[in-house]
Amino acid sequence: MTALFPFDNSYARLPSHFFGRVAPTAVEAPRLIRLNRALAVDLGLDPDRLESPEGVEVLAGQRVPEGAEPLAAAYAGHQFGQFVPQLGDGRAILLGEVVGRDGRRDIQLKGSGPTPFSRRGDGRAALGPVLREYLVSEAMHALGIPTTRALAAVTTGEQVIRETALPGAVLTRVASSHIRVGSFQFFAARGDVEGLRALADHAIARHDPEAARADNPYRALLDGVIRRQAALVARWLTVGFIHGVMNTDNMSIAGETIDYGPCAFLDTYDPATAFSSIDRHGRYAYGNQPRIALWNLTRLAEALLPLLSEDETQAVGEAEAALTGFAGQFEAAYHGGLNRKLGLATTRDGDPALAGDLLKTMAENEADFTLTFRRLGEAVPGPDGEPDPAAVEAVRSLFIDPTAYDRWAEGWRRRLKDEAGDAAARRQMMRAANPAFILRNHRVEEMITAAVERQDFAPFETLLTVLARPYEDQPDFARYAEPPEGGGRGYRTFCGT
């Protein structure tokens, strides 16, 4: 019989101080909550075997599968601006890597027991955070945003102690890699240039193979990470996503969204929104995310200085030149995304101001971010040059002062006259850019309460069904598109560790 996971491991071949070898800790009574069968097929795995007793034991950490080389990776990181020289995987164990139809992917268990980096923690995960990450990562994937994926969620039959006793669970996470900005900081902080070089060479081979042919491969690696992060954060903003804990150890060089602990989506639009209970000063607020991304990338550039050039002045020049490119790349991606949300297929000098004026009006009028843009797509002028009055009223109703929307919409409709194409095509473009469904924060809490307190996973399954098709109307699930009463003000998220 073939192996359950056809592992082809590369990170485990790196020097031993890159990680600590550790096996998952067995649990009492593993039970499968959900297997992502479609993802399993994409990875070249047999979903039926993964759902078998043997498969569930592997997904729970009860059994180490053939070919696995379980390890916990070492890394450092800036956490809320403060540098911590050693963090590492404290509750996650990399089983190995598989090569599927989309390339090489890590298979990692989260909540599978203590590791050398657990720092007195139990290495376990509670059910609520596991279900949250499963849902959010799959919702982000359906939205078309680069992200880690969830292969499976398993309950352990054990309790974990946080503020109270909670049911334990294990998440199987899939990622292009788990190399973080903090991975490079770990070696740079120790003055380990050879370790830094080995990690960079591994990253180039895995994520930027064309960089190996560049005049300066390490500068090309840095350029690639910057380009991916600029595009990623722009995509976050266009769907109202707030990561919540953008520490350097939570930034993947693969350009995937990773570590979903205290994340959330905007309800009412306010760029100062920060949901995380530990982000007391709004460092990682919605509108700060581009600035923080650049700050994190600057820390990566600092770590790479010894590789960029043997001459310190030249190395700094290379780093600064690379970082200078972030702003333009982010702005192009962000404003391109906003244009699509407004139904604009071409670019004009005044477009950023047009979008900015709408966002300002939304903030002043406490309009819902997702519903405003979705309904705007139905309010485009028809063949006769006039919008549907009912569609216009549906947008206006989201604003405290509907006439503020009216004033903005006059300029928008004038701008649309510069565009080719008919109203139907424009409406279709806007529907593809403006989701009807995001993972509403109050629905997350309802789902977690049902699962944790009543062992009822029906709300979890329903949300998975709805969020798999975020750009479709789905009339039977219309209530899941609605914001909470009060626009979500006062909502708080917790990292779950």
UniProtKB/Swiss-Prot annotation:
Sample GO molecular function, one term: ATP binding
The enzyme's E.C. designation: 2.7.7.-, 2.7.7.108
Reactions this protein catalyses: L-seryl-[protein] + ATP = 3-O-(5'-adenylyl)-L-seryl-[protein] + diphosphate; L-threonyl-[protein] + ATP = 3-O-(5'-adenylyl)-L-threonyl-[protein] + diphosphate; L-tyrosyl-[protein] + ATP = O-(5'-adenylyl)-L-tyrosyl-[protein] + diphosphate; L-histidyl-[protein] + UTP = N(tele)-(5'-uridylyl)-L-histidyl-[protein] + diphosphate
Family annotation (Pfam families): SelO (PF02696)
Positions annotated to bind Mg(2+): 250, 259
Residue numbers annotated as active site: 249 (proton acceptor)
Disordered as annotated region, ranges: 477-497
Names of required cofactors: Mg(2+); Mn(2+)
Residues noted as binding ATP in the record, renumbered to the chain: 88, 90-91, 110, 122-123, 173, 180, 259
Keywords: ATP-binding, Magnesium, Manganese, Metal-binding, Nucleotide-binding, Nucleotidyltransferase, Transferase
InterPro entries for the chain: Kinase-like_dom_sf, SelO
Top EC category: transferase
Protein role: Nucleotidyltransferase involved in the post-translational modification of proteins. It can catalyze the addition of adenosine monophosphate (AMP) or uridine monophosphate (UMP) to a protein, resulting in modifications known as AMPylation and UMPylation.
Similarity-based family: Belongs to the SELO family.
This protein's name: Protein nucleotidyltransferase YdiU
Species of provenance: Methylorubrum extorquens (strain PA1)
